[in-house]
Amino acid sequence: MASVDFKTYVDQACRAAEEFVNVYYTTMDKRRRLLSRLYMGTATLVWNGNAVSGQESLSEFFEMLPSSEFQISVVDCQPVHDDATPSQTTVLVVICGTVKFEGNKQRDFNQNFILTAQASPSNTVWKIASDCFRFQDWAS
């Protein structure tokens, strides 16, 4: 990270997170069969404590979920320091919001993503390396 100042990395992380969140939740709600394409081949999803790894297993998992309507309230992001992920541009994205799965009540959720930049000669694509989803049940 020495060649570019930290503010540039933060700005890049924010732009990537904003674009990613729009693509991810639109795909989740409207084109779920394509959702696993946003994940790296070795990615792991932890959904309320249950781990799912690999694109084929992720596809099967997402297809089992009822149709959804996500509403995003908060998006926070930060670049992951180069010492933690050498030679990889990595961003941590934290999301809070509500989701209504068909046949279920609306619930609060938190979701954390670790995204890595996958560069090709023509562009850079952000892929999910890790995803942790949790329903948020508040104490009354």
UniProtKB/Swiss-Prot annotation:
GO terms for cellular component: cytosol; nuclear pore; nuclear RNA export factor complex; nuclear speck. The gene is Nxt1. Its main location: nucleus. Transmembrane segments: none annotated. It comes from the Eukaryota. CDD domains: NTF2 (cd00780). The lineage of its organism: Eukaryota, Metazoa, Chordata, Craniata, Vertebrata. It holds the Pfam family NTF2. Heterodimer with NXF1. Forms a complex with RANGAP1, RANBP2/NUP358 and NXF1. Interacts (via NTF2 domain) with NXF1. Stabilizes the NTF2 domain of NXF1 by heterodimerization. The formation of NXF1-NXT1 heterodimers is required for the NXF1-mediated nuclear mRNA export. Preferentially binds Ran-GTP. Associates with NXF2, NXF3 and NXF5. Does not bind nucleoporins (NPC) directly, its association to NPC is mediated by NXF1. The modification N-acetylalanine is found at A2. The keyword Nucleotide-binding does not apply. GO terms for biological process: mRNA export from nucleus; protein export from nucleus; RNA export from nucleus. Coiled coil: none annotated. It is found in: Nucleus; Nucleus speckle; Cytoplasm. One of its GO terms (molecular function) is small GTPase binding. Stimulator of protein export for NES-containing proteins. Also plays a role in the nuclear export of U1 snRNA, tRNA, and mRNA. The NXF1-NXT1 heterodimer is involved in the export of HSP70 mRNA in conjunction with ALYREF/THOC4 and THOC5. This is NTF2-related export protein 1. Residues 16-135 form the NTF2 domain. It comes from Mus musculus (Mouse). Keywords: Acetylation, Cytoplasm, mRNA transport, Nucleus, Protein transport, Transport.
